[in-house]
């Protein structure tokens, strides 16, 4: 008997664009895109394929119409032409989760997120704001905010400000149950332990 697994996949569909715009998007967002399938609605150029392979991103070239729920986004060209918003005026809100986040659960948010329960293995958290986990963290965390606060870490799947933490960088997080605050200063990762 053939062994198969069924999976639900989140995907980005990219319409025909200038290769430079697509490469810029991929370079800027490759850490986030690790968790998605990228579907190109055209035959992509070799330089775009090189960037996809460099970052080990999953992609598909097809002209076939795919069914699924669509989330409305701005076209890539318009998105890259907009000036960056002034974050001091539009501070993200904070969402607090008092429950455990179970395996298979995915949370995508523009808010700051606080988790009082555990993040189980197989759960995925992606936030544009700061993330604080005061329970056991076994799942994947992708944080684009100014800081990441973790207590008891049992996962090596952590991305902070577009940087995938290496096993060497994750090791200091695994040693005890003290609260650790992760920040970045000029691309240098800073981990402080709070007793």
UniProtKB/Swiss-Prot annotation:
SUPFAM superfamilies: Cell-division inhibitor MinC, C-terminal domain (SSF63848). Pfam families: MinC_C. Coiled coil: none annotated. Residues 75-93 have a biased composition (Basic and acidic residues). Interacts with MinD and FtsZ. One of its GO terms (biological process) is division septum assembly. Belongs to the MinC family. This is Probable septum site-determining protein MinC. Residues 74-93 are annotated as: Disordered. Keywords: Cell cycle, Cell division, Septation. Cell division inhibitor that blocks the formation of polar Z ring septums. Rapidly oscillates between the poles of the cell to destabilize FtsZ filaments that have formed before they mature into polar Z rings. Prevents FtsZ polymerization. InterPro entries: CAP/MinC_C, MinC, MinC_C_sf, Septum_form_inhib_MinC_C.
